[in-house]
Amino acid sequence: MRTHRLAIVAAATVAALALSQPAGAQQRPLVTEDPEPIGAGRILLEGGLDLAHNQEYPASGLEGNLVRFPTLGLSFGISSIAELQFDGGLFNHLSISNRNPAPLAYLLTVTGDGTHDIEDLVVATKVRLKAEAAGSPSMALRFATRLPNATNESGLGLDTTDFFVAFLAAKTVQSVRLVGNIGLGILGDPTDGQRQNEVFTYGLSLARATTDHAEIVGEINGRVSTRAGEPSPGTESRGTLNIGGRYTRGSYRLDGAFFFGLTPVDPTAGITVGFTYVFTAFEVP
């Protein structure tokens, strides 16, 4: 029933987007990465607030409502075709509603009805391989490493280092900006340091402008475990449907979106709001 409802919402989102005007290459509140870099010598700063209902942590067994604030992103345009990215957050708080049996539950130092930690830092590089042309999409590669900043003891971290590589493509067709990602993630097993799990990553987003300043956006983004049988906790398949909008004035942009989990371990629903500021900061030789 839940999958059926989400399919209806996704179809309605695509239909609504198909009635608007095109949008350029932008990011928040979307997760699917556009292959276009921000430009040589430019810096992109973004921040936001996420509220997630029924967030699960299979490795620690904790479950509850999650607040992430602030979520932060910082990108540097190191050339006309390359971008260096840092994404993370300063404070994650989980209001615990359930404690389920889990392999790493014995490591928890949480005694009350809440726990908090920082967000794992993701360091990434995006390199555009081909600019968009009349008859072909723009293309890029993105390499990312997720560092183990959040801890097992808080129940919010896995203490693993993960690596991702993805192929990015985008095309503006008439009034539609369509972006697709496909890639591979190598996730450390939090229960056994000698093992890992490979996941297939995917993302598909659409964006349309309703006015010169406002857009509506939507996407499906997630990962699929490739391991035969039950994957290690924390490396399972995940997916999210995002529906939202953006409003841009000059170098500033405000955004907001509702998101819905596509798997049993994803949050049932949630909301994200944030801002983006882009400016020219330095010259690239």
Regions found by a protein language model. Name each.
Residues S20-P22:
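N-terminal signal peptide c-region/cleavage motif recognized by signal peptidases
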Residues G24-P285:
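Transmembrane beta-barrel domains of Gram-negative outer membranes and organellar outer membranes
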Residues M1-A11:
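Bacterial N-terminal signal peptides that target proteins for export
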